[in-house]
Design a protein with these regions (language model features):
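Conserved ABC ATPase signature
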Residues: 91, 130-134
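ABC transporter nucleotide-binding domain
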Residues: 174-263
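Helix-to-loop junction immediately C-terminal to a conserved catalytic motif
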Residues: 51
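Conserved ABC ATPase "signature" region
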Residues: 99, 103-126
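Conserved ABC transporter NBD signature motif
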Residues: 59-67, 75
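Catalytic Walker B motif of ABC-type/P-loop ATPase nucleotide-binding domains
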Residues: 155-158
């Protein structure tokens, strides 16, 4: 089976700044890949190169069987790209927006195609509502409907649920997985850890470099991080003290508990020993979270930048 995305050594520069630095990415059809990283890490630029909107300064590969450099027009016809910001017309209704997009694609029987998209995304009852009056969640549903009108084989979604309430986010992700079940490949950037865990696989980028790739469980296991959790009176108040302890990569309070992690088991023991006089606090080993791993990876990326 031909990979939906198979690119190697992607590079993009703006002046002297390299914003995407030799990124390799391979994604099989029907998979949902979460694309994570801090703001300014190169996620949007990578998505735009993959869908043919930006020309790479280096690298090669194929997208949907088309050459990344010479087949950009063919890639655009088979891919759907959803931008971070709502890009449809707020003074048009939902139906008018979708019919406009369908006509741009030159779709035959476009009214039938629009009716199907309205039904699929639960927009039929709101079809005559102005897009500008929609809440964030409904705007994202409309944007997704516009992306799938032409029957794309690949969806590139750039932080599609930013600023959307939890219920709307869950509903949106249910639709993403329904599309993947039909064989559509989805590459979606997100900052939400719960969304990352719903992906078949994850790619983490920082400062333009791909730092980790695999399932959530694989990335956690490969990180080598160790974690401990403290409970008891005053545990949460130790976060500031232990966050600066040598070897500790993260110390975060969650309610009345404290979570610390490090790649060095001995550093964890020393950190715990340094507050052993707090008799009301109990410590136990824990499993690192994706958030722990990504904070650790971002620290590594910063260290690499400092060295270079």
């Amino acid at each position: 089976m031909t990979a939906a995305i198979d690119v190697q050594g992607l590079v993009k520069r703006y002046g002297t700044k390299t914003v995407v630095d030799h990124v390799d990415l391979k994604l099989e059809p029907g998979r949902v890949c979460g694309f994570l990283g801090p703001n300014g890490s190169g996620k949007t630029t990578t998505l735009r190169m993959i869908c043919g909107l930006l020309t790479p300064d280096g690298g090669s590969g194929t997208v949907l069987g088309q050459d990344l450099l010479t087949g950009r027009d063919a890639i655009k016809r088979q891919a759907g790209y959803m931008t971070q910001r709502f890009g449809l017309y707020e003074d048009l209704t939902i139906r008018e927006n979708l019919e406009f997009v369908a006509r741009l694609y030159g779709l035959p029987h476009f009214k039938d195609v629009v009716a199907e998209a309205l039904t699929r995304l639960g927009l039929t009852e709101r079809q005559n509502q102005l897009a500008g009056s929609l809440s964030g969640g409904w705007k994202q549903r409309l944007a997704l409907a516009a992306c799938v009108l032409h029957g794309p084989k690949l969806l590139l979604l750039d932080e599609p649920t930013a600023g959307v309430d939890p219920k709307a986010r869950r509903s949106f992700w249910d639709e993403i997985h329904a599309l993947a079940a039909q064989g559509i490949t989805v590459l979606v950037s997100t900052h939400y850890m719960d969304e990352a865990e719903r992906c078949h696989e994850i790619a983490y980028i920082a400062y333009g470099k791909l730092m980790a790739r695999g399932s959530a469980a694989d990335i956690i296991a490969q990180s080598g991080l160790k974690a401990m959790v403290a409970t008891g009176e005053g545990a949460d108040r130790l976060a500031q003290t232990l966050s600066s302890f040598p070897g500790i990569t993260a110390a975060a309070a969650f309610g009345t508990t404290l979570h610390i992690c490090s790649p060095d088991a001995q550093a964890l023991k020393r950190a715990v020993a340094s507050v052993s006089d707090r008799k009301s606090i109990r410590w136990q080993e824990a499993t690192p979270t994706l958030e722990d791993v990504f904070i650790h990876l971002m620290g590594q990326a910063q260290d690499n930048m400092a060295v270079s």
